From Swiss-Prot:
GO terms for biological process: rRNA catabolic process; rRNA processing; tRNA processing. Its EC number is 2.7.7.56. It comes from Thermodesulfovibrio yellowstonii (strain ATCC 51303 / DSM 11347 / YP87). This is Ribonuclease PH. Phosphate binds at R86, G124, T125, R126. GO terms for molecular function: 3'-5'-RNA exonuclease activity; RNA binding; tRNA binding; tRNA nucleotidyltransferase activity.
Length: 236
């Protein structure tokens, strides 16, 4: 029995509220169960120095957690004066997965910043950030196209992400924190709406896993991501 009574192949309830931050070019509040993340997209009419005069854009991300997004208050990373290794890894993950579905030349010499702020953490914050970041990106691009800043839609495909793992010997979809903290195997999967993989992060936390286990987890993730993509496609 899972902590919240779900079946092993069942997602947590998903809620998505677009235009959550009025000042942003695109924004969303995404909820998967008790995990809640605010994602915004901001367009700048400049690119990093390494892309100067290359006539293409860039997408980058920042990720953070509120001090009381966790049961015990955590320190803000700004207090320590540096970004931690986990945060840096997640920021790079969000940026590169979103770039995989964007034609950067059609974006023009612009940078889109994706900011993901976790306001409540109960497992799957990085995957929720990727999915929410994609929705915020789409909204920002729509706004830019309506304003005539971008003439062609640079987004080539939809994207979503989910966690899977083996807990107490059972493959499970969309792990909450209680499951994630005791998982024997933990994976984060990112896929496109057309069914292609962008990222597969998998780790044996306790025991090595077999090829059969891997295929079971990939199949679970694919099922969950298809369901999330359907939710995204049905948004107003």
């Amino acid at each position: 029995m899972r902590p919240d009574g779900r079946k092993n192949d069942e997602l947590r309830p998903i809620k998505i509220e677009k235009n959550f931050i009025k000042n942003a070019d695109g924004s969303v509040l995404i909820e998967l169960g008790n995990t809640r993340v605010i994602c915004t997209a901001s367009i700048e009419n400049k690119v990093p120095p390494f892309l100067k005069d290359q006539k293409k854009g860039w997408i980058t991300a920042e990720y953070g957690m509120l001090p009381r997004s966790t049961p015990v208050r955590m320190l803000r990373e700004s207090t320590s004066g540096r970004v931690g290794g986990r945060t840096h890894e997640i920021q790079r993950l969000i940026g590169r997965t979103l770039r995989a579905v964007v034609d950067l030349e059609k974006l023009g010499e612009r940078t889109i910043w994706i900011d993901c702020d976790v306001i409540e953490a109960d497992g799957g914050t990085r995957t929720a950030s990727i999915t929410g970041g994609y929705i915020a990106l789409v909204e920002a691009v729509k706004k830019a196209m309506n304003a005539g800043m971008i003439t062609e839609n640079p987004i080539k495909d939809s994207i979503a992400a989910i966690s899977v793992g083996i807990v107490l010997g059972e493959p499970r979809l969309d792990l909450c924190y209680a499951e994630d903290s005791q998982a024997e195997v933990d994976m984060n999967i990112v896929m496109t709406g057309s069914g292609k993989f962008i990222e597969i992060q998998g780790t044996a936390e306790i025991y090595p896993f077999s090829k059969e286990n891997l295929l079971q987890l990939l199949s679970l993730a694919e099922k969950g991501i298809r369901e999330i993509i359907r939710v995204i496609n049905n948004l107003d």
